[in-house]
Amino acid sequence: MNPSTTQARVVVDELIRGGVRDVVLCPGSRNAPLAFALQDADRSGRIRLHVRIDERTAGFLAIGLAVGAGAPACVAMTSGTAVANLGPAVVETNYARVPLIVLSANRPYELLGTGANQTMEQLGYFGTQVRATISLGLAEDAHERLDSLNASWRSATCRMLAAAMGSRTANAGPVHFDIPLREPLVPDPDPHGAVTPPGRPEGRPWTYTPPVTFDQPLEIDLSADTVVIAGHGAGVHPNLVQLPTIAEPTAPAAPSGGNPLHPLALPLLRPRQVIMLGRPTLHRPVSALLADPEVPVFALTTGPRWPDVSGNSQATGTRAIVTGTPNPSWLDRCAQMNRHAVAAVREQLAAHPLTTGLHVAAAVAGALRPGDQLVLGASNPVRDAALVGLDTAGLRVRSNRGVAGIDGTVSTAIGAALGYERDHHGRTVALIGDLTFVHDSSGLLIGPTEPTPRQLTIVVSNDNGGGIFELLEQGDPRFSDVSSRIFGTPHDVDVGALCRAYHVENRQIEVDQLPAALDEPGSGLRVLEVKADRSSLRQLHAAIKAAL
């Protein structure tokens, strides 16, 4: 067995021992030893391999696999620009704390700076965006040192896994595992008895690192009028369930008996303190409250970092030790304002003459059932889901909130469905906008030999452009002569034709047909397109606020 083949097989074996169950592979020549090793592992049932031709979409597919299955995912590619195309996925997983292993092949280091083809300084390319960067030395044809090399390779692989999963830091994220490979890059005809150097007995990892316990209790007096803001990555806090809580869709669902608070109700109240869980990213009234120097903020997070955009947090921790008792009149008033806000949204949606993204979100939210997984686009869809009062009880809600880009969302949804279906029988529904869909339409390319989701429906709310800008300062009527082109970016793409090009089932329906369409029995991947209007979004949101 040649050295590159041996090294690749050892690394793949140790990744599997460390918990990797899904690997996305992008084709190339330099990463051939890894590709052969991964194919062998897939054929033997040790991993599930997903082959993709585009490294950018492959990275987001791996993100979806990781969050859907709750396990580290790996994406493997060749050298050069193939590595650079992982940049967006690496940045997203850094801030979203998703365990992603970028497994790149490299040229032998003596070729750097020589003008050799497809060669660049890729070690360290991701800089501070990764938790760790490790390069294995070139595999040597030294049988007498094989035991030592085996130990070194397996130890390095375990170090990568520990960094990716945050086993010693409580801060999961991406890592870059770079492996220079020398020719021959394809397996030799194995001599009789040639075997991969073994790992630990009984399939154990070479170096086991138990997950760190990160616990910082923080005492908080609840006698002041308190609201809870639960953002992305919020933990579960049963002792705060009675407090009025603005929960973003990706926050854990509140237990029964919770006290939900609609985000539009917040300006109608005067909280005296805030408990912030995770990282809020969606609502301007929330940002304004967190920036109010007169309102103390207590930040509870599940890792070592905490958000504090305005510098207003007074204390941080991981869980609350509560004292004092909430004022019943405060709880009652919050519940009343929540009902008022929910009713205002519902009434204005019913009165509005045109279909908007909010109407599509409301239809999707009403059609979901316990056990479903929901993937939301990072622009208007995740905000619309919050505004229409999505009930997340019994659901798993995903959205790329790390840096909240629209890129890679189709691939993330496909990966999330594939990952979720490993251990769950529920379906996956994705709600995304048309720009998000078009931006990552190449994610629809799933080869005929590749795993396909059992039940994934992508709902495209198509208002022919960037509807979110209608609601921002750029959408002010005084910019109407230019904003549609430079912010709205209409594209006139035929979504159905695009789906047909990738052999994906699709149809265009009206918003009132959406619940029935989502309930239809079926399998595989399909796209439901709902035409929506964005020109009246500003008017609709103004009407909702006026009704409050």
Curated annotation (Swiss-Prot):
* Superkingdom, natural source: Bacteria
Q: Which cofactor does it need?
A: Mg(2+); Mn(2+); thiamine diphosphate
Pfam families referenced in this protein's UniProt entry, alphabetically: TPP_enzyme_N
Q: Which pathway does the database say it acts in? A: Quinol/quinone metabolism; 1,4-dihydroxy-2-naphthoate biosynthesis; 1,4-dihydroxy-2-naphthoate from chorismate: step 2/7; Quinol/quinone metabolism; menaquinone biosynthesis
Tell me what reaction this enzyme catalyses: isochorismate + 2-oxoglutarate + H(+) = 5-enolpyruvoyl-6-hydroxy-2-succinyl-cyclohex-3-ene-1-carboxylate + CO2
Q: Which GO terms describe its molecular function?
A: 2-succinyl-5-enolpyruvyl-6-hydroxy-3-cyclohexene-1-carboxylic-acid synthase activity; magnesium ion binding; manganese ion binding; thiamine pyrophosphate binding
- Cofactor binding comment, as recorded: Binds 1 thiamine pyrophosphate per subunit.
Q: Which UniProt keywords apply?
A: Magnesium, Manganese, Menaquinone biosynthesis, Metal-binding, Thiamine pyrophosphate, Transferase
Q: Provide the GO biological process annotations.
A: menaquinone biosynthetic process
Record-listed E.C. numbers: 2.2.1.9
Give start-end of the signal peptide: none
Q: Subunit arrangement?
A: Homodimer.
Q: What does this protein do?
A: Catalyzes the thiamine diphosphate-dependent decarboxylation of 2-oxoglutarate and the subsequent addition of the resulting succinic semialdehyde-thiamine pyrophosphate anion to isochorismate to yield 2-succinyl-5-enolpyruvyl-6-hydroxy-3-cyclohexene-1-carboxylate (SEPHCHC).
Family statement: Belongs to the TPP enzyme family. MenD subfamily.
Q: What is this protein called?
A: 2-succinyl-5-enolpyruvyl-6-hydroxy-3-cyclohexene-1-carboxylate synthase
* Encoding gene (name): menD
